[in-house]
Amino acid sequence: MLKRLLSKCAEGKTLTEEEAYEAMATVMDGAATDSQIASLLSMLCLRGETVDELTGFVRAMRDRMMAIDAGDDVIDTCGTGGDGAATFNISTAAAIVISSLGVKVAKHGNRAVSSKSGSADVLERLGINIQSSPDAAKEALETNGLTFLYAPLYHTAMKHAAGPRKEIGFRTVFNLIGPLANPARCKRQVVGVYSTRYAEKLAETMRRLGSEHVLFVTGRDGLDECSIATETDVVELKDGAIRRFVITPEEVGLPRGELADVQVHNPEESAALLEAVMTVTAPESAVNIVALNAGVALYAAGKTKTIADGVTMAKDAILSNAAYRQLQRLRAKEVVRDA
């Protein structure tokens, strides 16, 4: 089956949704060779993936993940990664802020692959447990309002593609579909995308898969986050409609900042800067970029009617130390201690 589908791709043809499902299922069930996986990923990268293909791939990935029953009122803040900007873990900081405001967050993430610091790396440095069972994850969500879903634990079938992905080295379709396969089956998300040219395709894919409100964001300085230093391109899926717009820091009540203020070299620096944001001892740009991204998430969650209102609410949570108190709660509940 996979040989036939590879031949079809080699002829420049695209796969149907069902063919894409079968191709990804073959990969994730361990029935494809490393050469076949590398060939598929390479051809898709050169040609570009269609919405049918993305939908089939995500369906196959979701069908093989270990899911948790988190209810309908859960949001995720996750990115494709690979933006090369070496920023601290902004989406992780935003997740802590919005969870301090009563919005449940199922943060889906991994260790660093191409970045300086993955969300798992920085949470460990902060003393927050990342490797929990589905039952423990659900309990953390109910008691703390935030749980971290460590991708390798919930997507064990991904191990079959790990070798080829590492060997070829470039971004693949897995960077795009990973954020679309949250084990909590979130219908509301903010997804950072390393290139805005993928955003409409991803939005249409999520529409087909039943998402309610998702914003795909790309800073014009290359961030897979909303940028504090320049404009951010946004593609929004809301109630079945898709629209594109641009947001600037100024229009949501924030001054423009410096990208250098949010860049780090390693997980230790990232954790230190995240904590400094929570204690309001970080550079203003760092505090504001977290407020901006948290504000977008509050809007996606339906907590506010506008992004600007969300930013105001998020910044108040930081300045009032509500976000820092939430960080301390997460440490108290899930701190990792050596035996």
Curated annotation (Swiss-Prot):
One matching Pfam family: Glycos_transf_3
Assigned GO CC terms: cytosol
Binding site for Mg(2+) 2: 224-225
Enzyme nomenclature, EC number: 2.4.2.18
Pathway entry: Amino-acid biosynthesis; L-tryptophan biosynthesis; L-tryptophan from chorismate: step 2/5
Obligatory cofactor(s): Mg(2+)
Molecular function terms from GO: anthranilate phosphoribosyltransferase activity; magnesium ion binding
Catalytic EC class: transferase
Residues the record lists as binding Mg(2+) 1: 91, 225
Electron transport listed as a keyword: no
Binding-site residues, 5-phospho-alpha-D-ribose 1-diphosphate: 79, 82-83, 87, 89-92, 107-115, 119
InterPro entries noted in UniProt: Anthranilate_Pribosyl_Tfrase, Glycosyl_Trfase_fam3, Glycosyl_Trfase_fam3_N_dom, Glycosyl_Trfase_fam3_N_dom_sf, Nuc_phospho_transferase
Free-text cofactor note: Binds 2 magnesium ions per monomer.
Binding site for anthranilate 2: 165
One of the GO BP terms on file: L-tryptophan biosynthetic process
Description of how the protein assembles with itself and partners: Homodimer.
Family matches, as PANTHER family: ANTHRANILATE PHOSPHORIBOSYLTRANSFERASE (PTHR43285:SF2)
NCBIfam families: trpD
Family the entry assigns: Belongs to the anthranilate phosphoribosyltransferase family.
Protein name (record): Anthranilate phosphoribosyltransferase
Lineage, opening ranks: Bacteria, Bacillati, Bacillota, Bacilli, Bacillales
